């Protein structure tokens, strides 16, 4: 691998800068809260930190799993589990409380601002506001300053229960978005205002006299006071539709982040800076790989020559490995009649993700009357229904199973403009899509070998830090019987558990037709990405009446396994670009070698070396520009070219070249044949490290 794929320090929830304090009970050990006493008193009695420490307790979890404020007073003796700030739940609480502080600051500085929602999100929080003008960077600085004043004041978070919805409506009559939420029953996880057993507000109180300063409709929980926010930062602002619906008002969203310590915040901000440096959208332009022209539309990429080389290498290696593993390649069209997606269920369960239909094939008489009615065609959002038609195109025998079909199939999904994100969330993309048809008896072995194949192939591209996620049935959105789902889920769970990889449950996360295993990978920054999906489906074979002849001559239904290894070519391209910061392994790099002459007199010699490399299949160029050698080196270093070969008078005279690498190391005076051999071996061996003088082994050299 070219870079470590371990999480950044502290990403596991611990703070390596804070030494362990002896004598304190583990925050994970339950404690007793006596009836009539506060949770805070019980936490203090247990000797646990409640303020100032990176593992300070901010809330507790009751026996039902519900998070409770430290001010909570139970009616009976209860056992609770303290939740420290340096855990996912703890961070979520301080981030939500910080969002309240942000909203208070906005209404202090912009009194006409109307409040939207302000949930915690991964690594941060946001709050939506209806304001006359977009927020500027100067506004964010002023808001952050006001927030620090609020934090310093130590305002108390106080929970208040409404006696009725009517009481809440009266209080929030001047806040139209909050008023809408009073009656919300959507269950949307991002709506923190409602959804609990009671309709509540949280007031910010003056710590000295208890007077209400500000408040928000909210189900909680929250930290005790604003002083319990250790470290925060506002990061950016953007436009956002109210509740993500383009038909609603456009609001202004402010994003921020909050952490358990200044050190943890600093680490996170450093990671953000590094992530911005690695952003595939930025690198795609800088390295001339791909672009998103406005003339084509949002979420639709075009790959330039260099990007197409990387993509071709990705595809060709995958194609070869699939052929070796017994897959058969197929091709299907981009559009299909509507009936296919009625049969599959996509138009019933996935209509919001499909582009509008094209009405075609209608024929009219001269007088305008319809001679032949037309029909709707759809851009395909998935390849699976078409692959079932390949299976059913003729009779099948058990001897043909498992039948492994594979396609680089371009599909189209209607993603809202607000969620489109470069190559990783596009509207048109190519899935490396496989559908395997097997018997029930073959299912377990096929799943086990498939998971191993997926992990091995991803490892060949330099990704190695994996865990699995098991997505199970959404009770509100599924087809088929409970028994079929249980059988499919059990098969996937057994294979996942036998893999020895960490397994994370994802209840309700499956598609409507079957449960799935998702292979998650951590990149060089420790960020998690969903890669491959493996989905067991008993339902499509039933819906499409798929059959094979078994050994005893009876007709049986096959089991169908859906599998996308990269997820999509485009998404995998974007992830690899960020993982390697644009410095692709030499075997993937669009330009593998560039020759840099000291002067124009050395061009012809380097062109001979380039011809020798090209004859071995190495993508080689010679820089014949009029720029000075130093400028050429900088340019090709910035373009992430793995190998630079320099040549001057001495090299021409001795038949040698000098290696120059991206880390500024160099190997001088290497015989050209030895140089060619070293480069070819490095590429053929598919080394994923970026070459350096230390790593590249050559005969001779200085």
From Swiss-Prot:
UniProt-listed SMART domains: tRNA_SAD (SM00863)
MF annotations from Gene Ontology: ATP binding; metal ion binding; threonine-tRNA ligase activity; tRNA binding
Keywords: Aminoacyl-tRNA synthetase, ATP-binding, Cytoplasm, Ligase, Metal-binding, Nucleotide-binding, Protein biosynthesis, RNA-binding, tRNA-binding, Zinc
Cofactor binding summary note: Binds 1 zinc ion per subunit.
InterPro entries in alphabetical order: aa-tRNA-synt_IIb, aa-tRNA-synth_II, aa-tRNA-synth_II/BPL/LPL, Anticodon-bd, Anticodon-bd_dom_sf, TGS, Thr-tRNA-ligase_IIa, Thr/Ala-tRNA-synth_IIc_edit
GO cellular component terms attached to this protein's record: cytoplasm
Gene Ontology biological process terms in this record: threonyl-tRNA aminoacylation
Keyword RNA-binding among UniProt keywords: yes
Function comment: Catalyzes the attachment of threonine to tRNA(Thr) in a two-step reaction: L-threonine is first activated by ATP to form Thr-AMP and then transferred to the acceptor end of tRNA(Thr). Also edits incorrectly charged L-seryl-tRNA(Thr).
Protein name in UniProt: Threonine--tRNA ligase
Source species: Mycobacterium leprae (strain TN)
Upper taxonomic lineage: Bacteria, Bacillati, Actinomycetota, Actinomycetes, Mycobacteriales
Encoding gene per record: thrS
């Amino acid at each position: 691998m070219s870079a470590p794929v371990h999480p950044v320090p502290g990403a596991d929830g611990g703070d390596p800068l804070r030494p362990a304090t002896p004598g304190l009970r583990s925050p994970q050990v339950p404690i007793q809260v006596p009836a009539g006493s506060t949770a805070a008193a019980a936490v203090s009695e247990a000797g646990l930190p409640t303020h100032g420490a990176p593992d300070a307790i901010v809330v507790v979890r009751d026996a039902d799993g519900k998070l409770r404020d430290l001010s909570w007073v139970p009616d009976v003796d209860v056992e609770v589990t303290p939740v420290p700030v340096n855990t996912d739940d703890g961070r979520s609480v301080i981030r939500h409380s910080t969002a309240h502080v942000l909203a208070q600051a906005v209404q202090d500085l912009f009194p006409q601002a109307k409040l939207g929602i302000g949930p915690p999100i991964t690594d941060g929080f946001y709050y939506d506001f209806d304001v006359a003008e977009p927020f500027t960077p100067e506004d964010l600085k002023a808001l952050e300053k006001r927030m620090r004043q609020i934090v310093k004041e130590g305002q108390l978070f106080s929970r208040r229960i409404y006696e009725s919805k009517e009481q809440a409506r009266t209080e929030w009559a001047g806040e139209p978005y909050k008023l809408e939420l009073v009656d919300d029953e959507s269950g949307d996880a991002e709506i923190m205002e409602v959804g609990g057993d009671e309709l509540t507000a949280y007031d910010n109180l003056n710590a000295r006299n208890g007077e209400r300063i500000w408040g928000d409709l909210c189900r909680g929980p929250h930290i005790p006071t604003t002083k319990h926010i250790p470290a925060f930062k506002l990061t950016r602002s953007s436009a956002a539709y109210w509740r993500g619906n383009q038909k609603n008002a456009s609001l202004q969203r402010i994003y921020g982040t909050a952490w358990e310590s200044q050190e943890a915040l600093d680490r996170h901000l450093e990671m953000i800076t590094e992530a911005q440096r690695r952003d595939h959208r930025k690198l795609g332009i800088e390295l001339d790989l791909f672009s998103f022209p406005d003339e084509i539309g949002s979420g639709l990429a075009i790959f330039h020559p260099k990007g197409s080389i990387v993509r071709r290498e990705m595809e060709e290696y995958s194609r070869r490995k699939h052929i070796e593993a017994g897959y058969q390649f197929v091709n299907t069209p981009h559009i299909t009649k509507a009936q296919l997606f009625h049969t599959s269920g996509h138009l019933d369960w996935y209509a919001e993700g499909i582009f509008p239909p094209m009405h075609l094939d209608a024929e009219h008489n001269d007088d305008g009357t319809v001679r032949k009615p037309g029909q709707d065609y759809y851009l395909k959002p998935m390849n699976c229904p078409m692959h079932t038609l390949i299976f059913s195109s003729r009779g099948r025998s058990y001897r043909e199973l498992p039948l492994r079909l594979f396609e680089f199939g371009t599909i189209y999904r209607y993603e809202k403009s607000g969620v489109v994100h470069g190559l990783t969330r596009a509207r048109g993309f190519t899935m490396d899509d496989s559908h395997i048809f097997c018997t029930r008896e073959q299912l377990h072995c096929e799943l086990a070998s498939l998971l191993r194949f997926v992990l091995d192939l991803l490892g060949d591209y330099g990704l190695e830090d994996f865990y699995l996620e098991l997505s199970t049935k959404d009770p509100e959105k599924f087809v088929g019987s409970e028994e079929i789902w249980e059988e499919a889920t059990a098969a996937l769970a057994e294979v996942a558990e036998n893999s020895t990889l960490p397994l994370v449950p994802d209840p309700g996360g499956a598609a409507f037709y079957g449960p799935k295993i998702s292979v998650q990978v951590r990149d060089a920054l420790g960020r998690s990405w969903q890669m491959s999906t493996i989905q067991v489906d008993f339902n499509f074979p039933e819906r499409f009446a798929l059959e094979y002849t078994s050994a005893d001559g009876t007709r049986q239904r096959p089991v169908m396994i859906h599998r996308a290894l990269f997820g999509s070519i485009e998404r995998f391209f974007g992830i690899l670009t960020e993982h390697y910061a644009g410095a692709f392994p030499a075997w993937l790099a669009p330009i593998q070698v560039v020759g840099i002459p000291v002067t124009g007199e050395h061009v012809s010699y380097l062109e001979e070396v380039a011809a020798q490399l090209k004859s071995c299949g190495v993508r080689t160029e010679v820089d014949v520009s009029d720029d000075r050698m130093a400028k050429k080196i900088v340019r090709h270093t910035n373009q992430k070219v793995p190998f630079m070969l320099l040549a001057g008078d001495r090299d021409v005279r001795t038949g040698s070249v000098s290696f120059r690498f991206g880390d500024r190391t160099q190997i001088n005076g290497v015989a050209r044949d030895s140089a060619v051999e070293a480069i070819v071996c490095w590429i053929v061996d598919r080394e994923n490290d970026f070459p350096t003088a230390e790593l590249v082994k050559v005969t001779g050299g200085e």
